Swiss-Prot record:
Keyword Transcription regulation applies: no
Protein name per UniProt: Ribosome biogenesis protein Nop10
GO biological processes: pseudouridine synthesis; rRNA processing
Organism: Methanococcus maripaludis (strain C7 / ATCC BAA-1331)
Xref: InterPro entries: H/ACA_rnp_Nop10, H/ACA_rnp_Nop10_sf, Nop10_arc-typ
Record-level GO cellular component terms: ribonucleoprotein complex
Pfam families: Nop10p
Molecular function as annotated in GO: snoRNA binding
Biological function: Involved in ribosome biogenesis; more specifically in 18S rRNA pseudouridylation and in cleavage of pre-rRNA.
SUPFAM superfamilies noted in UniProt: Nop10-like SnoRNP
Keywords of this entry: Ribonucleoprotein, Ribosome biogenesis, rRNA processing
Gene label: nop10
């Protein structure tokens, strides 16, 4: 059983069809892990600015 997402409305589900719009849901993949964080400096700057 994998998590799926409706491409039309963006809802997440475990079913083959979206309960909201009856569109066929697709399997989602997480972003690839990399020890080199390309956007880390931007994320840290935003976090520092919010404090």
């Amino acid at each position: 059983m994998r998590m799926k997402k409706c491409p039309k409305c963006g809802k997440y589900t475990l079913k083959d069809f979206c309960s909201g719009c009856n569109e066929k849901s697709v399997t989602i993949k997480p972003p690839r892990f990399s020890p080199v964080d390309k956007y880390g400096k931007y994320r840290r700057a935003l976090k520092k600015a919010k404090m």
